[in-house]
């Protein structure tokens, strides 16, 4: 290790930490992965999956393992250095990618994946963080810590890949999955490249399946019988959902892109295309030169000369806490000052002007050599700098597109993303100021974003926009499917609204009282349970409820509750019977009459000379 100088830490994961280093001989920048566990022999080292897989893989779109060093029982992997990962590349942009850029990124990902599968491995952890970039022009697959050989014998472990990119057969605990799980993950990544939002942002494994069903619809038993067997074995039933056209969720994607994503995101792994088959899809047959360009293949030499890393600063990752197995995962981010969200600016999708793709020809695609031009010693003049974290991943529910329109008007939409998955203290204090413990939020107030985890941007999706079309969008769809609405107590909803439908504007209507009525005002009560629970009543009028200090319990018979009189006798107070009683059959209930019979006791027996007259009380002779 004395041949390398470590400069700063790039990341820290479950199995090891990643450092940025420089070769003392050539000055070349490298990424050094230091394993946490100790290795006492070379045989132990060579049995690692990462070593076994990477030493066999040499491809322009697969990260290069330069050497393995064992020193003082510590193991070090020396990798080529890459500027950033795909997640950081998306996060740091304020404009969506044009489709030509997405096509080139997807082509490189599928090229690398096809090479991995061809050599008998599948990755098992495909996600944007494990796709390393030198800008959008060069993408490489990294982190083979979970890779398996295709010929290895199942059962495999059930926990693989990050949840948002996990295939349904893995979510249903299949033990015989294979390379199609990588194709599913690539389909999810492709959708995210168009929108900068995860397509299936589940908060748990079960919620992940719900999110998939909400987009793809409930699978039919005839379409995926193995899936129903897996579901029944773990006592799971698929939720009944109607599929959404991906064009609604990804309006800036061409029809060929939608078709390719639909094929890769098939419930049945046997029906998904392989990576090689996906490369032959018409989506890639547009006459565009795909693959890394020559000067980006040599961009690392530019970094060696121009990139002077700053002093180490603590990175501020604002994403969900996850293991960081990525070997080159995250350049050290520098703390960013709080700033307002910048709306995403859409780039006109190129498919509107591009010529229709020519018919599929066998000879057209068999030009892999042209896709990987020779290395030319040209050095770009633009310096490369590391960019810190600016915000968390953007979510569904913030963008409303006009159906049938292009992305030109995306600049008018509210595309700001929350900078944290946790609620900010400012937002929480603001909510406390605007809400009192005795009332619902006012109709015009925004609902505070204190939901946990993935629902952090739901309140932004609830804002009405009269200028935009009410076409079925991801915002409206997820809102309809939500099991609860923020700021609304479901118990009070069932109490007041009865069987009425609660929609996204529930807190704007008159179902929810804005303030309590005055003490001692006319109180209307209805019988909430005519058959039993004689003492249970619920507030029915608009005047609110009665505080507990105005109530008093009398006796144990029937467990009645009476209102304490406010300056008048009990005879002046009666229960008002309004329309709420009309819906119950049987005789009417007069609580005054019945309760008075219960409360009235026999007159006390007069005492004799100040003592109780037991004979008068119990009978007998004096």
Curated annotation (Swiss-Prot):
GO molecular function, one term: metal ion binding
Cell compartment(s), UniProt: Nucleus; Cytoplasm; Cytoplasm, Cytoskeleton, Microtubule organizing center, Centrosome; Cytoplasm, Cytoskeleton, Spindle
Entry keywords, A to Z: ATP-binding, Cell projection, Cilium, Cytoplasm, Cytoskeleton, Developmental protein, Differentiation, Kinase, Magnesium, Metal-binding, Nucleotide-binding, Nucleus, Phosphoprotein, Serine/threonine-protein kinase, Spermatogenesis, Transcription, Transcription regulation, Transferase
Signal peptide feature range: none
Reaction it catalyzes: L-seryl-[protein] + ATP = O-phospho-L-seryl-[protein] + ADP + H(+); L-threonyl-[protein] + ATP = O-phospho-L-threonyl-[protein] + ADP + H(+)
GO cellular component terms given for this protein: axoneme; centrosome; cilium; cytoplasm; midbody; mitotic spindle; motile cilium; nucleus
Post-translational modification: Autophosphorylated. Phosphorylated on serine and threonine residues.
Annotated tissue distribution: Expressed mainly in testicular cells at and after meiosis.
Highest taxon, organism lineage: Eukaryota
Domain (Protein kinase) ranges: 4-284
Record keyword Transcription present: yes
Catalytic residues in the record: 125
InterPro entries assigned to the protein according to its UniProt record, in alphabetical order: Kinase-like_dom_sf, MAP_kinase, Prot_kinase_dom, Protein_kinase_ATP_BS, Ser/Thr_kinase_AS
PROSITE patterns documented for this protein: PROTEIN_KINASE_ATP (PS00107), PROTEIN_KINASE_DOM (PS50011), PROTEIN_KINASE_ST (PS00108)
Region (Disordered), start-end ranges: 301-373
Assigned protein family: Belongs to the protein kinase superfamily. CMGC Ser/Thr protein kinase family. CDC2/CDKX subfamily.
Function: Essential for the regulation of ciliary length and required for the long-term survival of photoreceptors. Could play an important function in spermatogenesis. Phosphorylates FZR1 in a cell cycle-dependent manner. Plays a role in the transcriptional coactivation of AR.
Protein name (record): Serine/threonine-protein kinase MAK
Organism of provenance: Rattus norvegicus
Gene: Mak
């Amino acid at each position: 290790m004395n041949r390398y100088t470590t400069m700063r830490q790039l990341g820290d994961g479950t199995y090891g930490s990643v450092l940025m280093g420089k070769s003392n001989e050539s000055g070349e920048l490298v990424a050094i992965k230091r394993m946490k566990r100790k290795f006492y022999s070379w045989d132990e080292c060579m049995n690692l999956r990462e070593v076994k897989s990477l030493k066999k893989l040499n491809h322009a779109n697969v990260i290069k393992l330069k050497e393995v060093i064992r020193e003082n029982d510590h193991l070090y992997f020396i990798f080529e250095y890459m500027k950033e990962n795909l997640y950081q590349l998306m996060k740091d942009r304020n404009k969506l990618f044009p489709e030509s850029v997405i096509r080139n990124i997807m082509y490189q990902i599928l090229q690398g994946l096809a090479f991995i599968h061809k050599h008998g491995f599948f990755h098992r952890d495909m996600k944007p963080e494990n796709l390393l970039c030198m800008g959008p022009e060069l993408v490489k697959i990294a982190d083979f810590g979970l890779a398996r050989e295709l010929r290895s014998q199942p059962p495999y472990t059930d926990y693989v890949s990050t949840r948002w990119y996990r295939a349904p057969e893995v979510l249903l605990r299949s033990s015989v999955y294979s390379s199609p799980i990588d194709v599913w993950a690539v389909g999810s990544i492709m959708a995210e490249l168009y929108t900068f939002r995860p397509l299936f942002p589940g908060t748990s494994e079960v919620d992940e399946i719900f999110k998939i069903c909400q987009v793809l619809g409930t699978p039919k038993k005839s379409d995926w019988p193995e899936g129903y067997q897996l579901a029944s074995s773990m006592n799971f039933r698929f939720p009944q959902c109607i599929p959404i056209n991906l064009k609604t969720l990804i309006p800036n994607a061409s029809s060929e892109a939608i078709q390719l994503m639909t094929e890769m995101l098939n419930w049945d792994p046997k029906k998904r295309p392989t990576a090689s088959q996906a490369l032959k899809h018409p989506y890639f047959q547009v006459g565009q030169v795909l693959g890394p360009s020559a000067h980006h293949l040599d961009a690392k030499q530019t970094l060696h000369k121009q990139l002077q890393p700053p002093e180490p600063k603590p990175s501020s990752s604002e994403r969900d806490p996850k293991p960081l197995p990525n070997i080159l995962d995250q350049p050290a981010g520098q703390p960013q000052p709080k700033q307002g969200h910048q709306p995403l600016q859409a780039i006109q999708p190129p498919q509107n002007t591009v010529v229709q793709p020519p018919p599929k020809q066998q000879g057209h695609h068999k030009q892999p050599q042209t896709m990987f031009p020779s290395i030319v010693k040209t050095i770009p003049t633009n310096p490369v700098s590391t960019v810190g974290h600016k915000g968390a991943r953007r979510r569904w529910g913030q963008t409303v597109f006009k159906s049938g329109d292009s992305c030109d008007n995306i600049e008018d939409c509210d595309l700001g993303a929350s900078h944290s998955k946790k609620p900010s203290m400012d937002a929480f204090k603001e909510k406390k100021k605007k809400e009192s413990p005795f009332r619902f939020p006012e109709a015009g107030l925004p609902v505070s974003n204190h939901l946990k985890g993935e629902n952090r941007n739901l309140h932004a999706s609830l804002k009405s926009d009269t200028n935009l079309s009410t076409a079925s969008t991801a915002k409206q769809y997820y809102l309809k499917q939500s099991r609860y609405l923020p700021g609304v107590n479901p118990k009070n909803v069932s109490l007041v609204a009865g069987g009425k439908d609660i929609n996204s504007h529930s807190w704007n209507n008159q179902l929810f009282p804005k303030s309590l009525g005055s003490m001692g005002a006319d109180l209307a009560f209805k019988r909430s349970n005519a058959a039993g629970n004689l003492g249970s009543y619920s507030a029915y009028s608009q005047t609110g409820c009665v505080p507990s200090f105005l109530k008093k319990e009398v006796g144990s018979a029937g467990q009645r509750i009476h209102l304490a009189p406010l300056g008048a006798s009990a005879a002046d107070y009666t229960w008002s019977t309004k329309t709420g009683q009309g819906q119950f059959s049987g005789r009417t209930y007069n609580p005054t009459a019945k309760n008075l019979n219960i409360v009235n006791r026999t007159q006390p027996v007069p005492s004799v000379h100040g003592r109780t007259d037991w004979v008068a009380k119990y009978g007998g002779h004096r």
